[in-house]
Every structure is written in C-alpha cells, then in structure tokens.
C-alpha cells in the first residue's frame, strides 16, 4: 500500500507562455503551449512519488478528455489510482498564463461538474498501510471524514493550506502538519502580521508542525512561539506553476525519509526551486538524487522580512 494517500484537487492545465501579460480585449500570440496536469494535492503526490516515496490518489475524475488525462498522468508518475472513480461530467481544468518576462503566472480555472468523492468513499481499507493523509481543502466533506479516520488509525494528516474555502475551519483541528501560505494564515485568523497569524493558528488548532510559506521570501517554522526561518535557493525561474504544491509534497517525502522539520523545509525549498527552472507543474519536479546534488552545490539564503 502507498505511504501517502491524497485527497484534493486534480486538474488539467492548459499552459501558455507569453513575453508580456495580455491587455484586456486584445489578442496575443503565445510563445509555447503545453498540456499538463496540476492541482495542489495531485502535484504534491507526484512530487512524493518522484522523490522516491509511494503515493496514491483517492478521488474522482470526469469521463471527459480532461479526466482521462489526469488519471493517465498520475499513473505515468507512479501515483496509484486504484481508488480513483470515473464519474459522468467535466473534470476540473484551468488555463495558466506564464509571463516569461517576470515569471509570473495567472490561472483561470473551472471546477468542472463531475461528482466529487464523499465520506462514503473513505474506509479503513482505503487508508490501510498509509503513514500520511495529504489534503488541500478541496472535497472538504471527504477530507474531513478521511482525517477523522486517519486520526483513529494513527496516520499523520498533512495539509497544503492555500485556499481558504468555506467551512475549512472544520478540517483544521484534524491536521497534524499544517503548512499554509501567509495569505491563508492571515485570512483565516484575521491577523495583520504573518507572525501573529502563526501564533493564532497554533492557539486555535494545535498542529504538531506549523510551517508558513511566503513564496520567494521562503518562510518559517513556528516553534515555541517564535519563527525559525528556512532558506530559499535563488534560481533563474521560468515556470513557478506548481512550486508551492511541490514544496508540500517534498516536505512530506523528507519526513518519510527521517529528516527533521528544519531539514525537511530546506529539502522542500530546494526541490521547489529546481522545479521553477523548468516548465510543467508535474513534469518539472526533480528526482531525489537531483535534489541532493543541488543541495551539495548550492547555498541557501535566509530572507528576513
């Protein structure tokens, strides 16, 4: 069985690169077009698999070309799809515009109308053998049911907290490893500063591990009431799409390999940086040995706010 079971978004991305962001109501020729799969949970699982740990996706896909591609891509990267059900309707998909001039990305997405997985899709059998349950806040009812069962089974629950979806606060108390973006942390808590938000998340939800991500600034571990910053690795970024999702998957993979929280953040930061040097949210994710080689030849930088 897989070491990590994931429940959350698995999307089909149409990726287009441009030399400048288009002005509204104009036409602009793309430099490149690529078709790929994405979504926070799915991309995190691909990262885990590419880094040498076993992963499985529990969810649904549409019976359209988007859904077929999502399932096929997961299987290509050795993510188990035994518990993926094909449902009538359109799979979630997005158009991602990447500005190669400044490496920004703009995403327009459609959730699709294929039925989502529900609590009834989660059983002890589906979670058996897992060490981690990885969620991203999508398919919330299913994720909550799975997290409750995971707690009973001694499975660690990790969360890529990027979207402050309605009723997300019902999932947060069940999370052991909480890694939100600073935007999520501030929005959920209503705090003015990221540090205040971290303290409030800890007070409310008591995660065992709390790491706040801050994009190009890196981020910090919130430990004993203070921040411990982790390094970033400056690179020539050409595609940041999926970088955050890669960080989350790499963090879980590092923990499975026995790394400390600080070591896991450093490893995840390096993995994310390498991903940014190539196109593709999932295709661009490096392998384990490549990350180790990168760490041996590159010094990280601590960015202070």
Predicted regions and their residues:
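Glycine-rich phosphate/adenosyl-contacting loop at the front of the ribokinase-like
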Residues: 1-60, 65-69, 76, 237, ...
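A glycine-rich helix N-cap at a beta->alpha junction
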Residues: 73-88
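Conserved phosphate-binding/catalytic loop of the ribokinase/pfkB sugar-kinase fold
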Residues: 84-86, 96-132, 137
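Conserved phosphate/ATP/ADP-binding segment of small-molecule kinases
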Residues: 147, 151-158, 162-229
